[in-house]
Amino acid sequence: MSTSTSMRRTPTLSLLTITITSLIFLSLFPRTQSEVITLTSDTFTDKIKEKDTAWFVKFCVPWCKHCKNLGSLWDDLGKAMEGEDEIEVGEVDCGLDKAVCTKVDIHSYPTFKVFYDGEEVARYQGSRDVESMKTFVLGESEKAAAKALESDKEL
């Protein structure tokens, strides 16, 4: 093998080694993808009507100081709820989807509501921390599911 051929292969081999090393390094870190689903005028009604599913939805606007002060709370809640069956965490930007917010009677921000089988079942007004919100939605979801089961038995 000539010296010039060997020199041309060295940069290619180095680049390949760096790429593989980088991919291995990045795979060691957990993904921080949010489990929060953005709901829009096109998706809101169908999503909250999902059978036997509770939706905990945050209604906000980008310019609201109180919404901004939530920081990563909603994303953190979405991650905390990831393993819970039949509970979804969603958000609506009332600046973009005013029709949705008008339909569900949103007049202040942020507003947090729980929907079950398409019906509003609760409004959250408690502490703004992941554990309190998680406890609330788990309890409301359980009550709504029991009520739905009772209604089904009556039919």
Q: Where are the language model's segments positioned?
A:
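Proteins that catalyze or organize thiol-disulfide redox chemistry
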Residues: 2-155
